[in-house]
Amino acid sequence: DELEMEEIRSNPVNRCYLCKRNLFRTLMAFAKEKGVEVLAEGTNEDDLHVYRPGIQAVRELGIRSPLAEAGLTKEEVRRLAAACGISAASRPSTPCMATRLPYGARLDYEILKKIEAGEEILRRMIGGNVRLRLHGQVVRIETDPERFSLALEKREEVVRQLKELGFVYITLDLEGFRSGSMDVGLESRGES
């Protein structure tokens, strides 16, 4: 359980590295017991061009990344999966819930479950890509720009249901959904 580890619970900038290192060390021990010599994971070509500190742990531990090694992008992986009849091909990405909080904000199950419940409400009501990013008492809704009008049309119900979960201030991010939005500013701080 990653949140049992203080170094991860404190949510540092290298949280993903620490978590992946822990996860893959555990998997490596299990694989060794089973006689498995090679472990592979799902990093793709696109992941190599954005802030992904977990990739460092993958490389350090000698885990293979066949999709990235083949130069396959996320879209190419989705197309291949669809061609093979794999249902996950059309599923929206679901990154770690810790990405919904700013670095340094302490992680705990209660807040992560609350964010997850809020995202599920938004998925049911407006669909598409949805993230709730929590900044203290402000929760920022990220969704696809083409879903803004639907979000505003259902504004009162969205606000009511999110407040029932305990969110105080609810905003719609006019930049829309974007992967890695909590990493904005890391380069200027020399942390990416």
Which residues fall in each region the model found?
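Active-site adenylate/phosphate-handling loop in enzymes that bind or generate adenylated species
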Residues: E4-S90
